[in-house]
């Protein structure tokens, strides 16, 4: 059988990425051009700046991905692209590049949900067994997803306000840390003590919903009040206390979901899945279910994960026309 090569594009936020996947499982290349340095001084992602950067580097990323994979343009069998959720201007750059490539080579265009990409990055670890449950934790999302089969995603619980990654970046800014702050808070937390009693919102409620706005506000108020009194607080202790509260919430809701939906596999994915504290808690507390976390290089935004997620869409012949548009608010369906 002839080899199949998927060329995948990811430009939903501040990473320009192009990857090549061979025969559904072998990731030959995964080129990522990060813009973090450009956004650091603003303390967050500036959509206009992100879009301009994507335009500047997308062509080079395509060339590098093909070269690294050792294939020519003519060998590409299909093109996969993130069409949402994300920043509309950023998404449009990837869509324009993907559609142009698909049109020029007369090959199928596969639309991929960015969050399905995060989830299916777990395929790089081992073949996934369905049904499974996924905890998706990133800068823009915190959700529990039931996956009955590849490509069939249903939200069973999500945040009512801030995403967990967003909360990390906001408290990081209060502590004077550079953006993005998640990794640094994780490191500081391992050096400090959990000595501040931050709220664990909705932790005892009988649902699978999350809330991080109260925790974020309590953190900001504590820090502000200490500054007003001229007291110096330890960033290590603040980080340890904040992270302990976050992990308590994530673990409580995940355990509750596993009770309600008895599956054999739990996938934990998204940028926050790189957090060492979260990985430690999962290893210590989730015993009877196989926990699969993508490798660190596939936790953040990347096109490799989009390629993995596109396989089930390809197998279902779920192709898009060249009129495919960006859907910045795209979301999985909610379980009824």
Swiss-Prot record:
Cofactor comment: Binds 1 Fe(2+) ion per subunit.
Subcellular location, record wording: Cytoplasm
Highest taxon of source: Bacteria
Keyword Iron among UniProt keywords: yes
Organism: Streptococcus gordonii (strain Challis / ATCC 35105 / BCRC 15272 / CH1 / DL1 / V288)
Annotated Gene Ontology cellular component terms: cytoplasm
Reactions listed under catalytic activity: L-threonylcarbamoyladenylate + adenosine(37) in tRNA = N(6)-L-threonylcarbamoyladenosine(37) in tRNA + AMP + H(+)
Protein name: tRNA N6-adenosine threonylcarbamoyltransferase
A Pfam family of this chain: TsaD
PROSITE patterns found in the cross-reference section: GLYCOPROTEASE
Molecular function per GO: iron ion binding; N(6)-L-threonylcarbamoyladenine synthase activity
Signal peptide per UniProt: none
Listed InterPro entries: ATPase_NBD, Gcp-like_dom, KAE1/TsaD, Peptidase_M22_CS, TsaD
Keyword Cell wall biogenesis/degradation among UniProt keywords: no
Protein encoded by which gene: tsaD
Cofactor(s) demanded: Fe(2+)
Binding site for Fe cation: 114, 118, 301
Function: Required for the formation of a threonylcarbamoyl group on adenosine at position 37 (t(6)A37) in tRNAs that read codons beginning with adenine. Is involved in the transfer of the threonylcarbamoyl moiety of threonylcarbamoyl-AMP (TC-AMP) to the N6 group of A37, together with TsaE and TsaB. TsaD likely plays a direct catalytic role in this reaction.
Family annotation (SUPFAM superfamilies): Actin-like ATPase domain
Biological process terms in GO annotation: tRNA threonylcarbamoyladenosine modification
Assigned EC number: 2.3.1.234
Top EC class for this record: transferase
Family of this protein: Belongs to the KAE1 / TsaD family.
Keywords: Acyltransferase, Cytoplasm, Iron, Metal-binding, Transferase, tRNA processing
Sequence positions that bind substrate: 136-140, 169, 182, 186, 275
């Amino acid at each position: 059988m002839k080899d199949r090569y998927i060329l995948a594009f990811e430009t939903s936020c501040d990473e320009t990425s192009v990857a090549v996947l061979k025969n559904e499982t072998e990731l030959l290349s995964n080129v990522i051009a990060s813009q973090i340095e450009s956004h650091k001084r603003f303390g967050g992602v500036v959509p206009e700046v992100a879009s301009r950067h994507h335009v500047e580097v997308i062509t080079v990323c395509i060339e590098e991905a093909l070269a690294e994979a050792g294939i020519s343009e003519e060998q590409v069998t299909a093109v996969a692209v993130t069409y949402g959720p994300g920043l509309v201007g950023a998404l449009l750059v990837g869509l324009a590049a993907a559609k142009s490539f698909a049109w020029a080579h007369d090959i199928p265009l596969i639309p991929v949900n960015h969050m399905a990409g995060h989830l299916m990055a777990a395929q790089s670890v081992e073949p996934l067994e369905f049904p499974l449950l996924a905890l998706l934790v990133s800068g823009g999302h915190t959700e529990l997803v039931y996956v009955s089969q590849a490509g069939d995603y249903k939200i069973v619980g999500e945040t009512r306000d801030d995403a967990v990654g967003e909360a990390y970046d906001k408290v990081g800014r209060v502590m004077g840390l550079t953006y993005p702050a998640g990794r640094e808070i994780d490191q500081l937390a391992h050096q400090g003590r959990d000595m501040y009693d931050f709220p664990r919102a909705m932790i005892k409620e009988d649902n699978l919903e999350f809330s991080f706005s109260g925790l974020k506000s309590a953190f900001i108020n504590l820090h502000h009040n200490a500054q007003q009194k001229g007291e110096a607080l330890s960033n290590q202790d603040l980080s340890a206390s904040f992270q302990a509260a976050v992990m308590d919430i994530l673990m409580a809701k995940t355990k509750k979901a596993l009770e309600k939906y008895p599956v054999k596999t739990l996938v934990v994915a998204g940028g926050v899945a790189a957090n060492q504290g979260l990985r430690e808690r999962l290893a210590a507390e989730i015993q009877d279910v196989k926990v699969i976390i993508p490798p660190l290089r596939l936790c953040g935004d990347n096109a490799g994960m989009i390629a993995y997620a596109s396989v089930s869409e390809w197998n279902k012949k779920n192709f898009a026309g060249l009129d495919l548009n960006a859907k910045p608010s795209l979301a999985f369906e909610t379980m009824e």
